[in-house]
Regions:
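Glycine-rich, proline-tolerant flexible connector loops at the mouths of alpha/beta enzymes
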Residues: 15-39, 77-84, 142-151
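Hydrophobic faces of well-ordered beta-strands that scaffold small-molecule active sites
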Residues: 17-19, 44-48, 68-72, 110-114, ...
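Glycine-rich, N-terminal phosphate-binding loop and its surrounding beta-alpha-beta segment
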Residues: 31-67
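Generic alpha-helical hydrophobic packing signal
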Residues: 34, 38, 136-137, 168-171
Length: 188
C-alpha cells in the first residue's frame, strides 16, 4: 500500500513523502527502497533515530532516488532523556551534532526533530534547534509526540522558537501534531 500511495502522491506533486522508518523492520526498509526507486518528482524521506546505524539504513534504502531526505530525531524532554535514553542534556546535544553531521554526508536535505518537543524545556529546545541548524539541518520539526499540548500552547511554543532561536530563518519549521480528545492533561 505504501508504494501505491507514494505513486499517487508523486503524481499529485507532493513535495516530500516520509516513506517510513527503514531500520524498524525489513518490510519498512524494502518499502522505503521501493518508493525511492519509483518516485520521479517527490523527494522520499526516511526516519532515523540519532544513530549511525539508523542513518545508514536510511541512506541504503533511499539511495536509489535522485534526491532524498533523512529525518533524524532524538528525545529532548526531561522525562524521555532520563527514562528512555538515560542521557543528560550534554549527551543529547552531542548526539544531535553527530547525527545531523553524519546524515549530511549522504544528503544536503536533513530534517531534525526534537522528539516529545512539547514537554521539552524551552531554553534547552532553543539550544537543540540552533545546534541542529548549525550542523546542517534544513528543516526543524517540533512534534507533540504524546499528544500533550493544547493548540494555544503549541502556538506559543512555535512563536517562542521563532523569537529565541537566532538562526531559525535558515530552516523550514514544521510541526507534527498528535491531538487527542480529550487531552491527556484533562485526567490530571
Amino acid at each position: 500500500e505504501k508504494i501505491q500511495i507514494s505513486r499517487v502522491f508523486d503524481e499529485m506533486g507532493i513535495d516530500i513523502i516520509e516513506a517510513g522508518f527503514p531500520i524498524s523492520s525489513p518490510g519498512d526498509f524494502e518499502a522505503v527502497s521501493a518508493i525511492s526507486k519509483s518516485v520521479k518528482n517527490s523527494i522520499p524521506c526516511g526516519l532515523a533515530r540519532a544513530t549511525k546505524k539508523d542513518i545508514d539504513a536510511c541512506h541504503e534504502s533511499l539511495k536509489f532516488a535522485k534526491r532524498f531526505r533523512i529525518h533524524t530525531f532524538i528525545s529532548t524532554s526531561p522525562v524521555h532523556m532520563k527514562h528512555k535514553l538515560n542521557m543528560n542534556n550534554e549527551q543529547v546535544l552531542d548526539a544531535i551534532k553527530e547525527s545531523v553531521t553524519y546524515a549530511r554526508k549522504f544528503t544536503d536535505d536533513v530534517e531534525w526533530s526534537c522528539e516529545d518537543g512539547t514537554r521539552t524545556d524551552l531554553d534547552f529546545m532553543y539550544k537543540t534547534i540552533e545546534l541542529a541548524i548549525n550542523c546542517g539541518a534544513k528543516t526543524i520539526n517540533i512534534p507533540d509526540t504524546v499528544g500533550y499540548s493544547i493548540p494555544e500552547e503549541f502556538a506559543k511554543t512555535i512563536t517562542s522558537i521563532k523569537n529565541n532561536v537566532p538562526n531559525i530563518d535558515k530552516a523550514i519549521l514544521s510541526a507534527c501534531l498528535l491531538y487527542t480528545s480529550p487531552s491527556p492533561r484533562d485526567f490530571g
